[in-house]
Amino acid sequence: ANQKMAGLQTRDQAKTFIYAFLYGAGPSKIGKVVGGNARVGQQLTSKFLSNMPKLKTLRDNVTEAAETGTIKALDGRRLHIRSPHASLNTLLQGAGAIVCKQWLVHMDERIRKAGVDVKLVASVHDEYQFEVAKKDVERFGQITKDAMIETTSTLGMRCPLDCEYKAGTTWKETH
């Protein structure tokens, strides 16, 4: 959908554009990542935002709010803004971190209650790796899903979140 909204030819171009846009890249950088110049970058950004008016409103509101030096995060805390162009990224990255931390809290509560044999071995961005006894894999998988639903509710989110789990003996099998 983002590829179509931006009018880009390939999924790779769209993915690179989206990340550059969300990280606050300006027209020159956006033009460069899609094989063009600043004019192309400006046209692409304008087209994308005209096709996604709510995103434009969010970006404009967050950029304006960032002029105070902070913005309000998903859980109410204040996030410090280093630069207005990075304000949307700060909000989104902050939300992701808050969701993942709350999700881990809810998983821990449920794991203790269920008596599941599990150890956290890695936390990478929005992914957790656990060592789980074979007998508990399916039950633990359901705990992770239920904890994410509870996280959505705890944080008062209007958009439901979901997650998936994979079982394997190596990180490669579970990633």
Q: Model-predicted segments: where are they?
A:
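Conserved catalytic core of nucleotide polymerization and phosphodiester-bond processing enzymes
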Residues: 1-175
